[in-house]
Amino acid sequence: VNATDSAESGDAFSGKRVLVTGAGKGIGRATAVLLAARGASVVALSRSADDLRTLERAIGCETYAVDLADAAAARAAAQAAQPVDLLVNNAGIARLQPFLECDVQAFDETMAVNVRAAMIVGQVCASSMIERGVGGAIVNVSSISAQIGFALHAAYCASKAALDALTRVMAVELGPHGIRVNAVNPTVTLTPMAEQAWSDPAKASQMLSRIPLNRFAQPEEVAQTIAYLLGDEARMVNGVSLAVDGGFLAR
């Protein structure tokens, strides 16, 4: 069996325990389903207990309902999930406001979920890996919004740029311990959150016109990229922000 066959089959992540935040919907759920299908033991975090129940029925995962905007709760949930070999920091929120009307509460909550929670959960998981003397891999789910200024997305764009920067620092500091850290940066991905943000046909068509492949991403396509970065095939990939954008950033 060659590496490609193994990666596509049910054993690529056999024996690996992976923590996925924001696993209730969208990219996080698609990632949890894909990794479970490839043999991983999945631990799913989401603030929606209902979403976790349906996911648990689907893939038999361990679940923790938690609001990652709460720093203490985020740390406690991450600690309860240990030990893990792989981490996907996917949880994210978007509060759409014009810059001049962007309020402090929305800005702080966005940074808390999109950046601070990734730091906290990453600290817990990496500390456990180091204590156990094992390597691992972490993928932070960012966005092309880290590099592009989108109207109404001040807090969101700022949070994703911060997440990319955090990814690079994590890669530098954790690399010597055999822990790789990378980011994926999707274009608009057809998740419940994105479908709300891009429901205006005029806004959507303008965005599509900037994507050479002329379509938005599917959650499963982002999940497959995450799986690549987590897997042995990417064992020399560390500290990158990998666009999954149909060529948007190439223009």
Which residue ranges define each predicted feature?
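Substrate-binding pocket helix/loop in short-chain dehydrogenase/reductase
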Residues: P98-F99, D103-D108, M207
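Alpha-helical segment proximal to the catalytic Tyr-Lys
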Residues: S127, V172-P176, R235
